[in-house]
Amino acid sequence: MDTKYKDDLFRKYVQFHEGKVDTTPGKQSGSDEYLRVAAATLLSLHKVDPLYRFRLIQFYEVVESSLRSLSSSSLSALHCAFSMLETMAINLFLFPWKKEFRSIKTYTGPFVYYVKSTLLEKDIRAILKFMGYEPELGTAYKLKELVESLQVKMVSFELFLAKVECEQMLGIHSQVKDKGYSELDVVTERKSSTEDARGCSDALRRRAESREHLTTSMARVALQKSASERAAKDYYKPRVTKPSRSVDAYDSYWESRKPPSKASLSLRKEPLAMDVGEDLKDEIIRPSPSLLTMSSSPHGSPDDLPSISPINGLGLLRSTYFPTQDDVDLYTDSEPRATYRRQDALRSDIWLVKNDAHSIYHKRSPPTKESALSKCQNCGLSCSSSLCQRCDSVCPSASKPSGFPSKASAHDSLVHGAPMREKYVGQTQGLDRLATVHSKPKPSTTATSRCGFCNRAGATNTCTQCSKVSCDPCLGAYHYDPCCRKSELHKFMPNNQLNYKSTQFSHPVYR
């Protein structure tokens, strides 16, 4: 710093304040604005070490410690504090003989609110000691006997420069506060910079811009790194963790393209035959719409059903059925005879199949108003006549006293289920079995009991559980009929093996 320029400003400062005391007209000084401009120019000299800006007071250290330690301290508050201390110094070197300036009360309002709330106690004591004040009893500062007027003037001039420096730092802060800088940052920059106020503000702006650019670059690098890591994880992770929907659709498509299994019921164009010799199971079959159109009544028309083919050279009973263009598979759930339930026979859309030599198919269509109250006298099922087709074919003598042989059902050519796809033994065994069934001797008309199934005389068997009587033909035909009491099958025994004699029923017995 130019020492000559500073000494010249110090001399003008002293003359300005001494001129206030001179009462001679025309010699009183006006405003100190030119002094402020000169002081700002002095503090903004280029390439000047900050340590040479202040000689007595360590200005930047005092301001920095105050801003760090006191929450009520700020650059504007420090400006007021330095201005008040400057006034004390001016009064002391202008009026040293006045007693009111020989002591300073620390508990007064202006001192408490403007000085003690802004500066630290040690800094206040150091500044007042330069002016010649010593602390007394902790509540006041008392002036020493000998007062060096030159030193007091120099302290006053330093306080004046401190006030101007606070104004400059306030101006710098107003320019860079939008960049996130605080007053303490401005003080730190001003303390270490050899530039003027404009140079300090430009340096702070450049630093803020470089920091923002660095932050943006680091964020961009972090994003690129995270993206590359994610790409690496996606590359090395297993490709398939679970089957996708497309795979499921592909599998389901080929599942649907598989040929039907042997256990599924299908109306194909290969010849089908029935084995008469094997003990097959009864099946419950739900017909397709194409089959429902073939018969509109429980008995059906023989012309609507496929005919029985002649016996081939191997002695097999062959039956061929060519389905319609739909070729719809009939999926059934066959049940053994032991688990047959009577309520299944009462359903309106059920086909009952007895796999015997002459297979009998009985279909119950939904009852109409005319046939709703008509039931079979033998089995109790709803039908259009007094006897259903099954009971009519099993017991022809009871339903047709005229003696005409019962006509075979036209449904004999229908075969269902996987068991019916197997090849059968010769027809001769079936014919022998039929001859055996129909050649049984008729019961004597002198019997005292009537059959509980066909209501014919000659019941020679009795159930040991429900006491129901049955003839020999019905015993073979209805041996799977469930017992009414214990939901089990009937246990028929010949009457001659019972220890009691069955009584004669005077009325027809229904199922």
From Swiss-Prot:
Task: Give the motif span (PIM motif).
Answer: 320-337
Domain named PUB: residues: 77-149
Explain what induces or represses this protein's expression: Up-regulated following FSH treatment.
Q: Which InterPro entries match?
A: SPATA2_PUB-like
Q: How does this protein assemble?
A: Interacts (via the PIM motif) with RNF31/HOIP (via the PUB domain); the interaction is direct. Interacts (via the PUB domain) with CYLD; the interaction is direct.
Q: Can you quote a single GO CC term?
A: nucleoplasm
Q: Which domain of life is it from?
A: Eukaryota
What role does this protein play?
Bridging factor that mediates the recruitment of CYLD to the LUBAC complex, thereby regulating TNF-alpha-induced necroptosis. Acts as a direct binding intermediate that bridges RNF31/HOIP, the catalytic subunit of the LUBAC complex, and the deubiquitinase (CYLD), thereby recruiting CYLD to the TNF-R1 signaling complex (TNF-RSC). Required to activate the 'Met-1'- (linear) and 'Lys-63'-linked deubiquitinase activities of CYLD. Controls the kinase activity of RIPK1 and TNF-alpha-induced necroptosis by promoting 'Met-1'-linked deubiquitination of RIPK1 by CYLD.
Entry keywords, A to Z = Cytoplasm, Necrosis, Nucleus
Protein name (Swiss-Prot/TrEMBL): Spermatogenesis-associated protein 2
One GO process term, biological-process aspect: regulation of inflammatory response
Tissue specificity of this protein: Expressed in the testis and to a lesser extent in the brain, while skeletal muscle and kidney show weak expression.
The UniProt family comment states: Belongs to the SPATA2 family.
Q: What is the lineage of its organism?
A: Eukaryota, Metazoa, Chordata, Craniata, Vertebrata
Q: Which Pfam families match?
A: SPATA2_PUB-like
